[in-house]
Amino acid sequence: MKDLSRLAAFRAELARRKLTGFIIPRQDEFQGEYVAPYAERLRWLTGFAGSWGTAIVTLRKAAIFVDGRYTLQVRQQVDTQAFETLHLVDEPPTKWIEKNLRKGNTLGFDPWLLTANEADRFAAACTKVGAKLVPITSNPIDAIWKEQPGRPTASVATQPTQFAGRSAADKLKDLAGSMDADAAVLTMPDSIAWSFNIRGQDVPYTPVALAYAILHRKGKAELFIDVAKLPEDVQAHLRPIAIVREPAEIEPSLKALGRKKAQVRIDPSSAPSRIRDILKKAGARVVHGTDPCLLPKAKKNSIEQEGARVAHVRDGVAMARFLYWFDREAPNGGLTELSVATKLAQLREATGMLMDLSFNTIAGAGPNGASPHYAVTTESNQPLKQGELFLIDSGAQYQDGTTDVTRTLPVGEPTEEMRDRFTRVLKGMIAISRIRFPEGTCGSQLDVLARASLWRSGFDYDHGTGHGVGSYLSVHEGPARINKSDRTPLEPGMILSNEPGFYKPDSFGIRIENLVLVHEAKAINGGDRKMLGFETLTLCPIDRRLIDLSLLTREESEWLDNYHARVLKEVGDRLDGAELKWLRQACAPLD
């Protein structure tokens, strides 16, 4: 964003309120990855369109902080004369506060938009320099955003047990029985969608309704949601299991818990600090704990697992048709990032089962592929050129499962450098796919396997290797991940991505991604530990033109041949004619 009039108006509003500065996070009141248009405050002020970031604006300075996924994108979208663009690890917001605020300064924040943990960290940083962190419930951006969109109004639907695998009544009973408090406040819409077996359309790509809930150890749950969005069948579904209230009633209900001196559990990593403040001020005994839905939601039941398999076969057919089309059209020229992304979306739509995409397709041609979470726009849209690589990361929401797949494709003849880097990324992906590991193993213990071949050549990538994936829910789901620091044990039923990458700035990007399901593995002869492993769900050919066979071991080549044989069998049975002929060639054994 090069128009700085919004920044000037925002500073004028801060001065009017006698604030030194203000924190602007990407999050909304529900801390999800995707937000409704009304909550795109960070984008409106700065121009940054990524899914994670935080800005701090004072009367004289401004900075925006992003992680490694967005270091290139933020410089392209934000006026770097007006905003410092900083890496959150190298220069976190708290350190910036300590450097730039002084004694007596007041730093404002919206307590619905920062979690309890985040507010504590910012408060500690302010205290260090004698400044004060001040909650402001009337967001100053909302005061100057004259054309701010309204709140979402789309209808809510039920998620039938034929897809959910368990009734909402059973889930809520289990949650109440496992509670170590009188009540627990749920603030994450995907947790609420899972536990109540409902789905919504309030944010892009993730089928959730924006809502809060209070679970009680004794008595019905309370669900705080816009009742106008609930058709009669959904109200009938909820009536036996919940008291439905309007969103504005959350504060009175929290205060009622306080008057009872109830012990109330919140997750400080996701609950807005405002909720904690209301509870404490009202007299509740607040206890911190993880969202009680996180682990049971992540451990898919047998119905959800089978749904994921069916969804990935369906998605594999769409991907095969897309890759066949791409191989025919790319040599002719005329393709652009947007036209390719649109074609893939059309092929998924043609399945007749698509509910939505699971995220905004990342379609990066040449240098744009070097930005791991590049978001193509009409302004940035680039043609696909001969001699470049094209990275496409996409996914779908089907009622029986969520998909996420990345493939890197050559446009013309790849260079030796491209083939070397691609093969090293492939080796990492195969290493994760093949590993068997003992119960209790965390993603951080496996992460090195994906990076080892790149490390041997002095390379790495600045993102995690894998994230959890929901069941017709968020494509990025906790609590388990595969990265350098995660400490959550992997358990059967969890679905994660397996996506190592390599990025050469201003040149090209490479990523290969499959989804995998954690399952109990066969015992190892002579071993005494119960072992787990991964079942690969994604069914999509990996481009052999980018593979340097001399870098693959016999075991790696065998894995890839077996994988392609499975793709051909499960996807090929649903293709015919030229598309099937193409798939047979794409899945042929390596020479």
Per-region residue spans from a language model:
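Active-site neighborhoods and metal-handling regions in enzymes and metal-associated proteins
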Residues: 1-591
